[in-house]
Each structure stands twice: as C-alpha cells, then as structure tokens.
A protein has these predicted regions:
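N-terminal lobe of the biotin/lipoate ligase/transferase fold
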Residues: 2-167, 189
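Nucleotide and nucleotide-moiety/phosphate-recognizing core
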Residues: 103, 108, 128-238
Length: 239
C-alpha cells in the first residue's frame, strides 16, 4: 500500500478517536514530517482529517469518490476487485478493461471511473455520465465455462445489482431482461457483457455496469431514465 493509504487505513480503524503522531510514526515506520505529507495528500483527495496538538490526527469524513481504498474498505471478496484501476475520466471503462484483459490482467480486475463520455449499450447505443454522479465500472472475468453459457453472466449481474440496491438504497428495481434495471418504469442501470472466446473456451468476459446514482433531471433522457437521487429524493453515497 502507498504510505497515504496506510495512514488512511490506520485512521479509519481508530475513527472517531485520535491517533497520536508518535503512534502513527511507530506503526508506519515513518518520520513526523512524512506523516504530515501524507495528511496533506489525504486532505488533497477530499478526506476530512483533523489534527490537534498533543492529540494527533483523526478521520472525520471521506469523499464520495470511487477511490480504490474506499472500495477495498468495504469489499468482502477475494478475487473480484483484487486489483482496481481508478480513472477520473474515460470514454468507456469497458474499453479499458478489454485492453487490460488482452494484456493478461487477472480475473477480478475492476476498472472504475468518475466520468464516462462514450459508454456503450445494446445495439451500439452510446451514453455519458457527468463527473461523480454515477457508479461506472467494468469487471474482468475468466469463467471456465463454454461460450454458450456466458450470457448467463449478464442475468446473474442484474440480480446481484438489484439485491445490492435493495440492501444499500432501500429500493426494489425491476429487471428488464436481459440487461436493464428499472425504477418506476425508468432505466436506472444498464449492464453490457462483452465476450472474447474461441470455439470451446472463454478467453475473457468484460462486464460493464452503469448505475445512475446522483444525476438530476437535466442529466438524463426525459421520461426514459431515472437515478437513485430522483427516485429517493436525496443524494446517495456511491461507495
């Protein structure tokens, strides 16, 4: 882990209590000057880190960003998300994931982005998402199944996203098979699975997911799409 991420992990584990500078230096094996640089780095990324003389530092808040450290903090999987590629802006997370897969990226590699300008849907449709308002990611899978079974992955993903939304956001989306999730008849999430396969084996599968989280009405196609914010009437944390 990078030094700033190690400090974040330590502060998160002790929050909301303070951690003394001496304790930080000892546990991370760094100087006080290095600790201060790490604190500044975290603050620059949007973390609320309070420092007090003779008390040390404590973590007060975390930014609504898809930082790997934030995803890993709540991740309960071993393979999925074992490697996370974070992008502020990209055309398509699936394009990035596809290139990484062809280069041999391991199964479970996750590509996330804050903003996407050329996301893909079915039948070649494209769509975009403003910075910091959606949950945009693509996952590399290498399932040991014949290509004919690969489409089942999209259905499994749709069910998984629906269950996650029920648990995290308290809403119950309907599934428009095979790859859309709807709230009140409007699209809130799209899933696109792209396959690279030979006759009898799957080389890799890229599963792209685009979830509308904090978009406002002006960000979306009228009458056809919605977001968790529009549905619930309040902003929703993305991590």
């Amino acid at each position: 882990l990078a030094e700033a991420e190690q400090l974040l992990h330590l502060l998160r584990g002790r929050a909301p209590s303070f951690v003394s500078g001496e304790d930080i230096c000892r546990q991370l094996n760094v100087s006080r000057q290095a600790v201060w640089k790490q604190v500044r780095s975290l603050r620059g990324q949007g973390y609320g880190v309070e420092g007090r003389p003779r008390q040390g530092y404590r973590l007060l808040s975390v930014p609504d960003r898809l930082y790997p450290a934030e995803i890993h903090a709540g991740l309960g999987t071993v393979t999925l998300g074992s490697r996370i590629v974070y992008l502020e802006r990209t055309g398509s997370t699936s394009d990035v994931a596809r290139d990484l897969a062809r280069q041999g990226a391991p199964e479970g590699t996750l590509v996330v982005a804050e903003e996407q300008s050329a996301g893909r849907g079915r039948r070649g449709r494209t769509w975009s998402c403003p910075f910091g308002r959606g949950l945009l990611f693509s996952l590399i899978l290498r399932p040991p199944v014949p290509p004919a079974c690969a489409p089942q992955a999209t259905m499994l993903a749709a069910v998984a996203v629906a269950r996650a939304l029920e648990k995290a956001a308290g809403c119950s989306p309907g599934i428009k098979w095979p790859n859309d999730l709807l709230l009140e008849g409007k699209k809130v999430c799209g899933i696109l699975t792209e396959l690279d396969a030979e006759t009898e084996r799957v080389n890799h599968l890229v599963m792209g997911v685009g979830l509308n989280v904090n978009q406002v009405a002006e960000d979306l196609e009228p009458g056809k799409a919605t977001s968790l914010r529009l549905h619930g009437g309040k902003a929703t944390g993305r991590v």
